[in-house]
UniProtKB/Swiss-Prot annotation:
Residues 30-65, 387-399 have a biased composition (Low complexity). Its main location: nucleus. It is found in: Nucleus. Residues 400-412 have a biased composition (Basic and acidic residues). GO terms for molecular function: DNA binding; DNA-binding transcription factor activity. Keywords: DNA-binding, Nucleus, Transcription, Transcription regulation. CDD domains: B3_DNA. GO terms for cellular component: nucleus. Pfam families: B3 (PF02362). The keyword Transcription regulation applies. This is B3 domain-containing protein Os02g0683500.
């Protein structure tokens, strides 16, 4: 491990630091050099040592200006020439991991080291080293990294400052990534070799899931199945089931006022809107939800008509009473009779009720005004006398009078 107290990083001052480090501050370099076999020449003159030191410094300085101790740190073969050509596999001891926070990779340009790990692996005498120490690390590719390690009294924390921002930028670290620190195993020289590594955070986000808060779009494609009403080759639209409550409400609020009736002149098209299906609709059992309103459009001579559908569109629902014998509803200028016996046969009554609720639409529904406005424009009750003659019942006179007044005139 190399400890220096200088904060100068120019080229000339860096060379002076390398010379001083070779004599004083890297003891494991001299130990390794003594343990290595001597070259062919046994000369130990100062000139020979100076030449070998300068050759080692020039070879290491050509790759990066901070590679002052990689002659011994990378290969462990001393500072002699040719030692850096061999890549030695070093056994490492894991020290600790640090999950970087947004402030660690932000604009503060510092990495906070947990106090328990800092005091255990990087002991620092703040009084003797006011400016901190320079720690040399190697990454997985063998590239050296130098960080200034110091203690901040203001926050009472151990931090790595200078050189850390360059590491974050090159490795593209983000908040949540993990930085791992380890050291070599073996003799004194191996234990002074420090290594740094990193790994990306585990991405648990589902790429197919939409971000929270964004509206869910309707499916762009729908599945079509043959629909057997009329035998005209129509299709039944089967939308996918709603995935969320928002999509369910979105489908309820669909509006088909921009529908082009000319495109539906040659076939039957089934649309779904926001009204409710009446309970007497046996042909619409395949509807995806009882909250959808289905009706069909067929071409006709005077416009688009709703053919064979028991759906009441944009009108006041007719509430059947078991005490009434007959009802007449005037919708869109057409009188519709709905005879229904109080206790008569269920099948015949249901069939007649289905035929009675079928509407012929003279104009498309999307070209009319809002039905809530039409309710406010009901005509005066001047047709009650004409329509009371159409209601007949074998019950008492009071019942006949009540039936006559129950006939609705919705001349829309």
């Amino acid at each position: 491990m190399e400890f220096t107290t200088s904060s100068r990083f120019s080229k000339e001052e860096e060379d002076e630091e390398q010379d001083e480090a070779g004599r004083r501050e890297i003891p494991f370099m001299t130990a390794t050099a003594e343990a290595a076999p001597a070259p062919t020449s046994s000369s130990s003159s100062p000139a020979h040592h100076a030449a070998s030191a300068s050759a080692s410094a020039s070879a290491s300085g050509s790759s990066t200006p901070f590679r002052s101790d990689d002659g011994a740190g990378a290969s462990g073969s001393g500072g002699g020439g040719g030692g850096g050509g061999e890549a030695e596999v070093v056994e490492k001891e894991h020290m600790f991991d640090k999950v970087v926070t947004p402030s660690d990779v932000g604009k503060l340009n510092r990495l906070v080291i947990p106090k328990q790990y800092a005091e255990k692996y990087f002991p620092l005498d703040a009084a003797a080293n006011e400016k901190g120490l320079l720690l040399n690390f190697e990454d997985r590719a063998g590239k050296p990294w130098r960080f200034r390690y110091s203690y901040w009294n203001s926050s009472q924390s151990y931090v790595m400052t200078k050189g850390w921002s360059r590491f974050v930028k090159e490795k593209r670290l983000d908040a949540g990534d993990t930085v791992s620190f380890s050291r070599g195993i073996g003799d004194e020289a191996a234990r002074h070799r420090l290594f740094i590594d990193w790994k990306r955070r585990a991405d648990t986000r589902d790429p197919l899931r939409l971000p929270r808060g964004l509206p869910l779009p309707m499916p762009l494609t729908s599945h079509y199945a043959p629909w057997g009403i009329g035998g005209g080759g129509g299709f039944f639209v089967q939308p996918s089931p709603p995935a969320t409550l928002y999509e369910h409400r979105l489908r309820q609020g669909l509006d088909f006022r921009a529908f082009n009736p000319a495109a539906a002149m040659g076939r039957q098209v089934l649309l779904f809107g926001s009204a409710r299906i009446p309970p007497q609709a046996p042909l619409l059992a395949r509807a995806p939800s009882p909250l959808h309103h289905h009706y069909t459009l067929q071409p006709s001579g005077d416009g688009v008509r709703a053919a064979g559908s028991p759906v009441v569109l944009d009108s006041v629902p007719v509430i059947e009473s078991p005490t009434t014998a007959a009802k007449r509803v005037r919708l869109f200028g057409v009188n519709l009779d709905n005879p229904h016996a109080g206790g008569g046969g269920g099948a015949a009554a249901g069939e007649s009720s289905n035929h009675g609720n079928a509407l012929s639409l003279q104009t498309p529904a999307w070209m009319r005004r809002d039905p809530t406005l039409r309710l406010l424009e009901l005509p005066p009750h001047h047709h009650h006398g004409a329509e009371s003659s159409a209601a007949s019942s074998p019950s008492s006179s009071s019942s006949s009078k009540r039936d006559a007044h129950s006939a609705l005139d919705l001349d829309l």
